[in-house]
């Protein structure tokens, strides 16, 4: 990652453009403050045709609400309780794939990634942050994205190996 800027969630999501493909980090690492700010932009008519990609996320998934039809399109690799009803109703799409193959979607270009919205641990003294519990497709999304928006969260656990990225 280069060109590091510290800013608010509302400012950070201004890099999202209509037609972009967004990756959200998974499970408890879903960046809720960024999701909320992105949805506010959608609600204000600033965005349309934005594709949201993620594995299973915990917490609210407001971008999957039918009020955002034409603004956000959810293309989920796994379907959790927070998006099950909208997926069953046809408002969101499910892309069946093995977890081990999710990184290939981004690296091959089969699924574009304009913006990766993630949570990371605090940086260590060498400037490395950890993806914590969300290495899965998030690592490939970070590597392939045009822009990475990271929420630094002191509660994200530091995991090593491929989870470490330089801030």
Segments the model singles out, each with a brief description of its role:
Residues 1-167:
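Conserved alpha/beta enzyme-core scaffold
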């Amino acid at each position: 990652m280069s060109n590091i800027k510290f800013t608010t969630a509302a400012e950070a999501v201004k890099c999202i453009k209509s037609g972009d493909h967004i990756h959200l980090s998974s499970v408890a690492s879903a960046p809720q403050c960024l999701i909320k700010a992105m949805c506010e932009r959608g609600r204000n008519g600033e965005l349309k045709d934005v594709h949201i990609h993620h594995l299973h996320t915990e917490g609210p998934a407001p971008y999957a609400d039918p009020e955002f039809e034409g603004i956000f399109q959810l293309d989920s690799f796994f379907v959790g309780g927070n998006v099950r009803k909208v997926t069953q109703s046809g408002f969101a799409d499910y892309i069946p794939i093995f977890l081990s193959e999710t990184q290939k979607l981004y690296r091959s270009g089969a699924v574009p990634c304009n913006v990766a919205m993630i949570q990371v641990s605090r940086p260590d003294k060498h400037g490395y942050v950890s993806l914590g519990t969300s290495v899965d497709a998030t690592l490939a999304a970070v590597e392939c994205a045009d822009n990475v928006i990271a929420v630094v969260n002191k509660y994200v656990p530091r995991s090593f190996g491929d989870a470490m990225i330089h801030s």
